Amino acid sequence: MAEKMRKAAPHVEKQVEAGKAYYTVFWSPLRKAEKYDIVRHVPAMAGIFELYYMDENERIRRMCISRAWYGGLRSKLRHDTDPELVMEASFRKVLNKYTCYYRYSLTNSMDDRLDVLHFFSKMYVPGQPVPQDSGRYQEIFLEEISPDKVVTI
């Protein structure tokens, strides 16, 4: 059963019970962030994505998690992985220096994207300001399913 879940198409599932939301994020496989690969493999749909890089010690490090609207995953990933287009100097430096990777998950719901991004941001950078959730639930819980077994929470 667990192996079958890891091979599921990238998407976000949600169950709601007693004012609490339980999300399951099914990630795409981790792929090298090259523009032609992104154009071939990333759909032009709404969703969330993570960017990673491989450091000098061959450890994978998270750069960011973000969201994209309709038509946006492909174009947003293309933009955010191109050092000539990225405005933030620290990102540009990482993109120029390291091999970068991405993974994504699809969800059409803007509110679900807000909740998932809020949860991840809260976990990744405790004590830092986080994006607002949708305000629909008292508590948000999340589980990740990754074909690469890369689980960050």
Q: Where are these predicted regions, by residue range?
A:
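Boundary/linker segments flanking structured domains
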Residues: M1-M63, R67-I153
